[in-house]
Amino acid sequence: KSRFLFEHLLEDANLQDSTHDFGRDIIPSIIRAHRVFAFTFQDREGNGDAYWRDVGTLDAYYAANMDLVAVQPELNLYDDAWPIRTYERVLPPPKFVFSGSDDPARKGHALDSIVCSGCIVSGGEVLGSILGPCARINSYSHVESSILFDNVRVGRHAKIRKAIIEKGVQIPEGMSIGYDLVED
């Protein structure tokens, strides 16, 4: 869970001899001290390599998530023959409103994206992104190539590009993220 990993990240951050890499330092230390479960990823047909991404850095984590929104991702979450099971809260389906608005800037849609249950895209635009459960994208906002965790709220006229937004964050109206390196 998040808290468990966070505590181990903090512990690792204080170690002088650590490279601060998940695969090299953090996961092995967790395995030594805790009961851990794993799933062996194997190529079903035996024709090639199994899917694997080292997500030990933010850039690698971002890239692995962006792989999932491809038309034919290497790790296909929709492959019935190789289901990936996860806990999912019982929430209403995602909702897209104001897509037929007379105002062309008020779109209410998501393209090439994964939108989780409980999300509402209310007059905003989402492109090539992943929206975690109960995210809310308000009117005239634009989210592109980004990962938004649970319960993120994006205010009206906000713009987000190539960002990872932690759960529960509220992006104020008119905020711009990912467009100006100095401001970010």
What are the language-model segments listed below?
Residues 3, 10-184:
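Left-handed beta-helix
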